[in-house]
């Protein structure tokens, strides 16, 4: 049996916030003078939102630096270097056809137990990172078949050990529902069927809210968790402008509905809201006051690595006076990524 080489995508995460620390295009030449001042503890054991900033319990400002644990709980074909077999259900079908369903179940169990281990979390912490983003599929919290199981407790088993590793090595954790009921993107990344049915299906929307409430009930008192990222990259760009606009108009309402469900059991954690069209379009949002612990999140994979290229995102952050979190960058040259990392923080 040939071994399968696993490719982990380590995507830099940086939080860009604060009036004088905002996506400054310094190119590494201009330095920001930082004043020494006494810290005032927040009185909370959780990271909190204060204007455009995140504040640690000790009163210090938190600048997120870290990585995604992509492909672990949401397998994506391109991370295996597959061309057309590009999501979990396709990979599962391929393995089952080649080696049988029993082997497929064994494969997925071995994959989950070995793809990310405590040693990986220790290494991430050693690099100077302070945060990990954990993408996951909603099916880990249902009886639907997924990665060789149909056990609604599997998601908690995987999250529990990740939380303990993060606690041990001093890392924050963001829970990212990368694959939502019905599919929220309409592309392979949501493990769906080519259309964001979440925006058409009441049953999918209710399940989406119910799962987030279940997760929040479990982790409401867990300070390792920085926040809940409700969905990843909703509404892709391959649909018509009219259809995109129709679904964009529903996005904020679904976010509000899920937030209300979470707040029934958890008032401690931050809610992260991604823009539509690859987490890049924030025009659908009109009400950023519906909760007092909100943070928006964006992604960047192309264009110039300059401040001008992300000025619309900066302007939205400044208008809302809320933090903006760069959740993913990558798929570019090393030089582009190095230049963009200089653009974001100061």
What are the roles of these predicted feature ranges?
Residues 71-73, 138-142, 181, 234, ...:
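Feature marks short, surface-exposed loop/turn motifs that line or immediately flank catalytic pockets
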Residues 1-31:
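Bacterial Sec-dependent N-terminal signal peptides
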Residues 26-129:
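N-terminal carbohydrate-binding accessory modules
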Residues 138-151, 338-346:
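C-terminal/domain-terminus segments
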Residues 43-47, 102, 200, 206-227, ...:
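Extracellular glycoside hydrolase catalytic/binding regions
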Residues 47, 103-132, 142, 146-179, ...:
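An active-site-proximal structural segment forming one wall of the substrate-binding cleft
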């Amino acid at each position: 049996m040939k071994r399968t080489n696993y490719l982990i995508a380590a995507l830099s995460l940086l939080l860009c916030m604060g009036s004088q620390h905002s996506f400054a295009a310094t190119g590494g030449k201009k330095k920001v003078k930082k004043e020494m001042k006494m810290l005032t503890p927040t009185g909370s054991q959780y990271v909190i939102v204060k204007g455009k900033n995140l504040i640690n319990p000790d009163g210090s400002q938190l600048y997120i630096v870290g990585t995604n644990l992509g492909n672990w709980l949401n397998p994506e074909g391109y991370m295996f270097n597959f061309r057309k077999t590009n999501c979990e259900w396709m990979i599962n079908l391929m393995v089952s056809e080649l080696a049988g369903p029993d082997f497929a179940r064994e494969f997925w169990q071995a994959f989950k137990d070995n793809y990310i281990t405590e040693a990986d979390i220790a290494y991430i912490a050693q690099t100077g990172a302070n945060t990990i983003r954990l993408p996951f599929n909603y099916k880990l919290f249902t009886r639907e078949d997924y990665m060789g199981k149909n056990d609604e407790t599997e998601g908690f088993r995987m999250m529990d050990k990740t939380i303990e590793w993060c606690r041990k090595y001093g890392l924050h954790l963001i829970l990212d529902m990368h694959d939502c009921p019905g599919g929220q993107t309409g592309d392979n990344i949501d493990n769906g069927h080519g259309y964001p049915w979440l925006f058409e299906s009441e049953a999918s929307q209710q399940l989406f809210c119910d799962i987030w409430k279940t997760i929040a009930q479990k982790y409401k008192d867990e300070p390792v968790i920085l926040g809940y990222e409700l969905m990843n990259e909703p509404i892709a760009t391959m649909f018509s402008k009219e259809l995109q606009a129709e679904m964009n108009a529903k996005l904020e309402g679904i976010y509000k509905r899920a937030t209300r469900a979470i707040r029934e059991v958890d008032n401690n954690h931050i809610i992260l809201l991604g823009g539509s069209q690859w987490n890049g379009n924030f025009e659908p949002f009109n009400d950023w006051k519906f909760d007092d612990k909100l943070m928006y999140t964006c992604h960047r994979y192309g264009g110039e690595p300059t401040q001008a290229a992300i000025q619309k995102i900066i302007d939205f952050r400044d208008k809302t006076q809320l933090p903006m979190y760069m959740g993913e960058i990558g798929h570019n040259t090393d030089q582009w990524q190095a230049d963009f990392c200089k653009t974001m923080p100061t």
